[in-house]
C-alpha cells in the first residue's frame, strides 16, 4: 500500500515536471526540473524502489 502511494506520487511529480518543461522558456527552469527529478530518484532509491522508469523520463527530458 505504501509503495503504491509512493509510486503514484512519483508519477504525479513526473507529470508536473513534464508539464513544466513543456511550457518552459528558459534553461534554468529545465535544470531545476531535472534537479527535482534526480532528487526524487535518490529518495526512491533509498526506499528500495526501482527507478528504471524515471531514467526513461530523464532521457526524454534531455
From Swiss-Prot:
GO CC annotation: extracellular region
Domain of life: Eukaryota
Secreted is among the record's keywords: yes
Keyword Transferase: no
Tissue specificity field: Expressed by the venom gland.
Keywords assigned by UniProt, alphabetized: Antimicrobial, Secreted, Signal
Signal sequence bounds: 1-24
Subcellular locations according to the entry: Secreted
Physiological role: May have antimicrobial properties, like most ant linear peptides.
Family, as annotated: Belongs to the formicidae venom precursor-01 superfamily.
Protein name (Swiss-Prot/TrEMBL): U-myrmeciitoxin(01)-Mg3a
Lineage of origin: Eukaryota, Metazoa, Ecdysozoa, Arthropoda, Hexapoda
